From Swiss-Prot:
It is found in: Secreted. Disulfide bonds join 7-14. Strongly inhibits juvenile hormone biosynthesis. May act as a neurotransmitter or neuromodulator. One of its GO terms (biological process) is neuropeptide signaling pathway. The lineage of its organism: Eukaryota, Metazoa, Ecdysozoa, Arthropoda, Hexapoda. Belongs to the allatostatin family. This is Allatostatin-C1. Expressed in the CNS and midgut but not in the ring gland, thoracic perisymapthetic organs (tPSO) or abdominal perisymapthetic organs (aPSO) (at protein level).
């Protein structure tokens, strides 16, 4: 699971 990666491509997903 690489959530930090999705946050990079999808900042909105980070929230």
């Amino acid at each position: 699971q690489v959530r930090y990666r999705q946050c990079y491509f999808n900042p909105i997903s980070c929230f």
